[in-house]
Amino acid sequence: MEQFGVRNPAIELDSIGLGAAASVRYNLLESHLYEEAIRRREADLTAHGALRALTGQHTGRSPKDKFVVRNAVTEDQIWWDNNKPMSPEHFALLHKDMLAHVHGKDLFVQDLIGGADHDYALPTRVVTEFAWHSLFIRNLLIRPERSALESFAPKLTIIDLPSFRADPERHGCRTETVIACDLVNGIVLIGGTSYAGEMKKSVFTVLNYLLPERGVMPMHCSANVGPEGDAAIFFGLSGTGKTTLSADPTRTLIGDDEHGWGENGIFNFEGGCYAKTIRLSAEAEPEIYETTRRFGTVLENVVLDEHGVPDLDDGSLTENTRSAYPLDFIPNASESGMTGHPETIIMLTADAFGVMPPIARLTPEQAMYHFLSGYTAKVAGTEKGVVEPEATFSTCFGAPFMPRHPTEYGNLLKELIARHGAGCWLVNTGWTGGAYGTGRRMPIKATRALLAAALKGDLDKAEFRIDPNFGFAVPVAVEGVDSAILDPRSTWADGQAYDAQAAKLVQMFVSNFAKFEDHVDGNVRDAAPGLRAAAE
């Protein structure tokens, strides 16, 4: 086996059973990965210098094909209602077969870090058969100093082989696609999918398992900080606006998707961003748009015209087109990936029913209720089979990535909010004037103006009304924002139709939360939307 590149000679791939590979290239830089990806016809060079790759049939995550090894340690730690179990025996067979599958192949290795706070960092080795996957994960995770690579010792190893096909009967999985996580031994196996986001979310899943035991709250959120050190976090599922809204030229970006909240404050799990690019424009999102035109960026499933120019309006391959780039491609990004404790917590939802206001103030109890509920819409393309938005509840705003029971994360969040006095807001980036199909998407300018008012403290002086359906406080007027959209009922042509839709959503909240009621105190239960009306 030929081996190239900077690495720790004590932990080369033959030491973990991958010695049958023809060659291994360790920690290649961007230019070399470009060369390999283009030479191997894995990807195309765009007119502006980015690398474009296509992922075939899998243009989003495959959550139904993700498994966690169930053993004596994880038996009582994992929320098995939400995580599919795989036996240690099936995992061992899968591992053995994937090791055999690399025979004669060229492999690429990146040694990276998950977690900007050194106290909680997870050294991660990612082994891929595609050069573009190696560039993708190099962009997304934190890159150690080159001098540190010779002594690098991973605590997590990810093996990603898209050409491998799992055998459901032999490997205890569902299809030929598999994402299998051995959380105790720090191994993740990915096969049968080229979608690069599986690697990133596997690191997130492992951190979400490890960190709560150390008193750290792992979060599916973006984060930024103002010039006065006023940090903010933005919870939300894919496509609800985490990346867009946290890329604010007046504030320093900490990260766009995954963070921890520990003793030292907020820290990014990653060193890059994975932004949705469908219908991205230079006018609305100039900083993110500019990343699509840079050397080093990976464009995933973006259509190119005959001149190699990306057409960001073309969703013919998928609505889930993406740009993966290092965090320092954003002009005002944090170099450290860390900041202090947040003063403001934003919970983003894309309300497909069009009945929620664009912003609402939450009490600490309401914040925990809405965190555990995780109401939003699955937005087209982020998961296989989702073609248009549909209402869903994804607890902790990231159920697919949360191995432990939601109340474990919810109680941690509640404790941290109480300790540090953060203000909490619910922001709807979804629909107004009607449900999806008849209404329109909330104007991003209005959302930005409302967020700015909340972050600056301007809303503290505003007049509020209590929403009759959801019980939270909604500002009556905000400077620079059309007051009509602050009252969602007034934006509907038919007020009675709004009332019926709102009542339907309230009942969905109540029904969904039933599974958590025995795990929370009475104050949190009483924070339910329309609780009295629902009980009557």
From Swiss-Prot:
The keyword Ligase does not apply. It is found in: Cytoplasm. ATP binds at K201, H220, G236, L237, S238, G239, T240, G241, K242, T243, T244, E285, R322, T447. Its EC number is 4.1.1.49. It catalyses: oxaloacetate + ATP = phosphoenolpyruvate + ADP + CO2. GO terms for molecular function: ATP binding; metal ion binding; phosphoenolpyruvate carboxykinase (ATP) activity. It holds the Pfam family PEPCK_ATP. Keywords: ATP-binding, Cytoplasm, Decarboxylase, Gluconeogenesis, Lyase, Manganese, Metal-binding, Nucleotide-binding. SUPFAM superfamilies: PEP carboxykinase N-terminal domain (SSF68923), PEP carboxykinase-like (SSF53795). InterPro entries: PEP_carboxykinase_ATP (IPR001272), PEP_carboxykinase_C (IPR013035), PEP_carboxykinase_N (IPR008210), PEPCK_ATP_CS (IPR015994). GO terms for biological process: gluconeogenesis. GO terms for cellular component: cytosol. It comes from the Bacteria. Binds 1 Mn(2+) ion per subunit. Pathway: Carbohydrate biosynthesis; gluconeogenesis. Substrate binds at R61, Y195, K201, R322. Its cofactor is Mn(2+). Mn(2+) binds at K201, H220, D257. Involved in the gluconeogenesis. Catalyzes the conversion of oxaloacetate (OAA) to phosphoenolpyruvate (PEP) through direct phosphoryl transfer between the nucleoside triphosphate and OAA. NCBIfam families: pckA, PRK09344.1-2, PRK09344.1-3, PRK09344.1-4. Belongs to the phosphoenolpyruvate carboxykinase (ATP) family. This is Phosphoenolpyruvate carboxykinase (ATP).
